[in-house]
UniProtKB/Swiss-Prot annotation:
Its EC number is 2.7.7.8. Mg(2+) binds at residues 487, 493. The lineage of its organism: Bacteria, Pseudomonadati, Pseudomonadota, Gammaproteobacteria, Oceanospirillales. Its cofactor is Mg(2+). Residues 554-613 form the KH domain. It comes from Chromohalobacter salexigens (strain ATCC BAA-138 / DSM 3043 / CIP 106854 / NCIMB 13768 / 1H11). Belongs to the polyribonucleotide nucleotidyltransferase family. It catalyses: RNA(n+1) + phosphate = RNA(n) + a ribonucleoside 5'-diphosphate. PANTHER family: POLYRIBONUCLEOTIDE NUCLEOTIDYLTRANSFERASE, POLYRIBONUCLEOTIDE NUCLEOTIDYLTRANSFERASE 1, MITOCHONDRIAL. HAMAP family: PNPase (MF_01595). InterPro entries: ExoRNase_PH_dom1, ExoRNase_PH_dom2, ExoRNase_PH_dom2_sf, KH_dom, KH_dom_type_1, KH_dom_type_1_sf, NA-bd_OB-fold, PNPase. One of its GO terms (molecular function) is RNA binding. This is Polyribonucleotide nucleotidyltransferase. Pfam families: KH_1, PNPase, RNase_PH, RNase_PH_C, S1. The keyword ATP-binding does not apply.
């Protein structure tokens, strides 16, 4: 086929979608060019279904190539390795809005690969990758109820909302939001903000949805001209006989099981009912059904029972109404040797969160297409299998753990002090020890508590809450603080984090084909109520950061010196600074502007290092007494080292009142003496005297503790 292009304006960028030139053997392939950023997006779908696979096998792989910015990869092998955190997060960002648009029952394997071929570093390539994926699916012929559009939205008081901000514009923006959706509805939101109001967040979502229509129109035009014929795929037919048989015998029993408030007991009861259903209905005899069909029908029955009760306004699975937060238990300072710790429990979801402070040298070095940078705030989320009562594989973090950790980080990050105000590297680890819904938001609450316990001066405490949705033709219900079952059986996962003043993070994933403004507004309002309730409970335990960091944390001090004295502190080949560190046990960071940061295991070591640095960088004062050591003797006097790196001359006439014929009669090299500074000439040569030190001055000086 001949190449086909469609071009449209997107904010201040020109976007071109091209197909038919590159990767022509893929089911669908689109090259997206956004200014000088180029991303190749491919889709391959298998025609055959693996009958042993009980789920939809969609995989998304976003990869950044270093040649895109004219670089060769580091490391021994000099090639790209396993996915970076950025690549993993972007893969999830692409996956989330497209997954609900594949029809129910479609089980063919679909693989999406997005490769960044070139980037101008002005824009994150993620939006180009999302648009390219949508376009590749739209032209592939695969059953897909798209296309979707995607937009990044920024906001500040001067400009209001703005589309497709550059990396530089995001630095001054109060919002970084990615919105994705179809022509009619929003499907996904991912954002971080600086305490924006709920109305401002909702406005950003609506603005992004409105602006993405240009992209959707262009993608649809590309599909109309270059799209392949749609697959002749039909959804599997429901076996109404099986569903009726299940409902007749098990609907009431399933309803009773979902009135058991304890999660593990409820799961045991449902498992027993499922086994009973399989025993009665599954088999190879006449009138029996395949085991997989029975399992699928039983899952549908569970979903229908729970959803219908919620829509009818009945109590939820654990007996709550739609707006009630589960009981909270909050503890801080629970781990004795850590720098800060908290245990946050909400119902059957629990997070043990630990904050650790380190030096700026502990900051993580991140290499990306945008260049190298150091990250001094790390938040890691761990979800071990025991948290849900299972035995499972223990290994490195999975995509879900990386994504939940980043969401929790977004919720807290806006409240952190600046590096100038708090020059520590901060690591927070959230260990999920129990899980029954919204563990990422428990991590936000626990992180805020642990950071305050560690003495990190947060601008304000933050809390997070997860909202759910059940929607059908009869109406909808928004649920506050959803359980795991409500998340699984519902239509939306809507997570909001923030302070009393506003929202710091918002994430939304829709499992149906979009929601409207009314539902989002209701969810934001209920989330606001719940967040204030949780913050009120948190404040009864710890309302503000501790005034000092933990005694177990590194002692840190910052001093300013004359920038011209930096070389004196470093010394020849770094000898001086190494000696200070070896002698005191402290570590020292120097900035070009003369800022000296000193880190030590305790305050004594920090003070010793400070005193040494100040002594090295101090200027001698005329008339002041110093304790020095004779460094060298000459015929005309003696050179005395009286400050680190600073010598002065005691002339032969300034040793004693009487005449001196031989300096060595009075002084010897290595001898300790008390000297007075007489003068400093314009070449910074220091004149010292021993004889001018009076007996009274000497006695007072020796009585003063050495600094």
């Amino acid at each position: 086929m001949n190449p086909v292009k469609k071009t449209f304006q997107y904010g201040h960028s020109t976007v071109t979608l091209e197909t038919g030139r590159i990767a022509r053997q893929a089911t669908g392939a689109v090259m997206v060019t956004m200014d000088d950023t180029v991303v190749l997006c491919t889709v391959v779908a298998k025609k055959d279904v693996n009958p042993a696979q009980p789920f939809f096998p969609l995989s998304v792989h976003y990869q950044e190539k270093t040649y895109a910015v004219g670089k060769i990869p580091g490391g021994f092998f000099k090639r790209e390795g396993r996915p970076t955190e950025k690549e993993t997060l972007t893969s999830r960002l692409i996956d989330r809005p497209i997954r609900p648009l594949f029809p129910n029952g479609f089980m063919n394997e679909v693989q999406v690969v997005c490769t960044v071929l070139s980037t101008d570093r002005n824009h994150d390539p993620d939006i180009a990758a999302m648009l390219g994926t949508s376009a590749a699916l739209a032209i592939s012929g695969v059953p897909f109820n798209g296309p979707i559009g995607a937009a990044r939205v920024g906001f500040n008081e001067d400009k209001g909302y703005f589309l497709n901000p550059t990396v530089e514009e995001l630095e001054s923006s109060e919002l970084n939001m990615v919105v994705a959706g179809t022509e009619k509805a929003v499907l996904m939101v991912e954002s971080e903000a600086k305490e924006l109001l709920e109305d401002e967040m909702l406005g950003a979502v609506l603005f992004g949805h409105q602006e993405m229509q240009a992209a959707i129109t262009a993608i649809q035009a590309l599909a109309d001209e270059a799209g392949k014929p749609r697959w002749d795929w039909q959804p599997p037919t429901d076996d109404t006989t099986l569903k009726s048989a299940l409902a007749a015998e098990f609907e009431a029993k399933v309803g009773e099981a979902y009135r058991i408030t304890d999660k593990m007991a409820r799961q045991d009861a449902l498992s027993a009912l499922k086994d009973e259903a399989l025993e009665r209905l599954a088999g190879e005899e006449s009138g029996q059904y395949a085991a997989d069909d029975v399992k699928g029908a039983f899952a549908s029955l569970e979903k229908r029972v729970v959803r219908s009760r919620i829509i009818q306004g009945e109590p939820r699975i654990d007996g709550r109404d739609h707006r009630t937060v589960r009981p909270l238990s909050i503890e801080v300072g629970t781990l004795p040797k850590t720098h800060g710790s908290a245990v946050f429990t909400r119902g059957e979801t629990q997070a043990v969160v630990v904050a650790t402070l380190g030096t700026l040298r502990d900051a993580q070095l991140i290499e990306s297409l945008e260049g190298e940078r150091k990250d001094r705030f790390l938040l890691h989320y761990n979800f071990p299998p025991y948290s849900v009562g299972e035995a499972g594989f223990m290994g490195g973090p999975k995509r879900r753990e990386i994504g939940h950790g980043r969401l929790a980080r977004r919720g807290v990050q806006a409240m952190l002090p600046s590096e100038e105000d708090f020059p520590y590297t901060i690591r927070v680890v959230s260990e999920i020890t129990e899980s029954n819904g919204s563990s990422s938001m428990a991590s936000v609450c626990g992180s805020s508590l642990a950071l305050m316990d560690a003495g990190v001066p947060l601008k304000a405490p933050v809390a997070g809450i997860a909202m759910g949705l059940v929607k059908d033709e009869d109406g909808f219900a928004v649920l506050t603080d959803i359980l795991g079952d409500e998340d699984h059986l519902g239509d939306m996962d809507f997570k909001v984090a923030g302070s009393t003043a506003g929202v710091t993070a918002l994430q939304m994933d829709i499992k149906i084909e979009g929601i409207n403004e009314e539902i989002m507004e209701t969810a934001l309002q209920q989330a606001h109520e719940a967040r204030l309730h949780i913050l009120e409970q948190m404040n009864t335990v710890i309302a503000q950061s501790r005034s000092e960091v933990s005694d177990n944390a590194p002692s840190m001090a910052t001093i300013k010196i004359d920038p011209d004295k930096i070389r004196d502190v470093i010394g020849k080949g770094g000898a001086t600074i190494r000696k200070i560190c070896d002698d005191t046990g402290a570590s020292i960071d120097l900035d070009d502007d003369g800022t000296v940061r000193i880190y030590a295991e305790d305050k004594t070591a920090a003070k010793a290092a400070i005193d040494t640095v100040l002594a090295i960088t101090a200027e001698p004062e005329i008339g002041k007494l110093y304790r020095g050591t004779v460094a060298r003797i000459t015929d005309f006097g003696a050179f005395v080292t009286f400050m680190p790196g600073t010598d002065g001359l005691v002339h032969i006439s300034q040793i004693v009142p009487e005449r001196v014929n031989d300096v060595r009669d009075y002084l010897s090299e290595g001898q300790e003496v008390i000297v007075k500074v007489l003068d400093i000439d314009n070449r910074n040569r220091v004149k010292l005297s021993i004889k001018e030190v009076t007996a009274e001055e000497k006695a007072a000086f020796e009585a003063t503790p050495a600094e």
